[in-house]
Amino acid sequence: RLGATRIGHGINLLSDEDTLLRMRDSRFLVEINLISNELLEYVPNLDLHPFPIYLRQGVACCLNTDDRGMWDSNFTDEVFVAVQRFNLSWAEIQKTAYNSYEFSFAEESLKRELVDSFKHDLDIFQKQFSGSNWQTVLAEVPAVTYGYGRNALKLKL
C-alpha cells in the first residue's frame, strides 16, 4: 500500500481487473490526460483510450492538461477532445469536474468552499443555457484554445 489517492494517466489499469475493481470501489482517482497520452503515443489511437470505460464503470476520473506548455494545449482542448471522442453526457462532464475538487490536495474546508462555489456557478450556467436561446447565449461565451486546439482539432476560437 503506497497511500496514493490519485493515479496519473492510468493507461494500463484495464490490464488488472482486481486493481480496476479496487479503484472503482475505493476512494481513488485517475487523472486523465488525453492530449498528452495521444502525443506521447501511450495509446495507439485516442479512440482506444480507456477513459470512457473507467468513467462509465464508476472509477473516479478527472480531466487534466498534464503539461500545457509542452503540448500547447489547455483545459478547453481536453474537454473538447473528451466530448468529441467519447460522446460524454452533461452528467459525465459535471462528474469529472466535481472529482477535480473532491480529490484535490486542498484542505477539506477549502474543498467544501470550492465545491459550493462550483455548484453555485454551475447552477447559474445551466439556467443561462436552459432556455430556447441557448445558442445565442453560448455564442457570447469566450472560449480559449492554444496551438493544439487550432492545429489538431481545427478549432476557430
Residue ranges and their predicted role:
Residues V59-N74:
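Short acidic/histidine-rich active-site segments
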Residues R24, L55-R56:
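Anion (oxyanion) recognition and catalysis
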Residues G10-L14, E41-N45, G69-M70, Q84, ...:
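Alpha-helix capping and helix-loop boundary segments enriched in small/acidic/polar residues
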Residues W71-D77, A91-E92:
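Short acidic alpha-helix initiation/capping motifs at coil-to-helix transition points
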Residues P44-P52, E78:
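Charged helix-capping and loop-helix junction motifs
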Residues E78-Q84:
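A short alpha/beta connector and helix-capping loop motif
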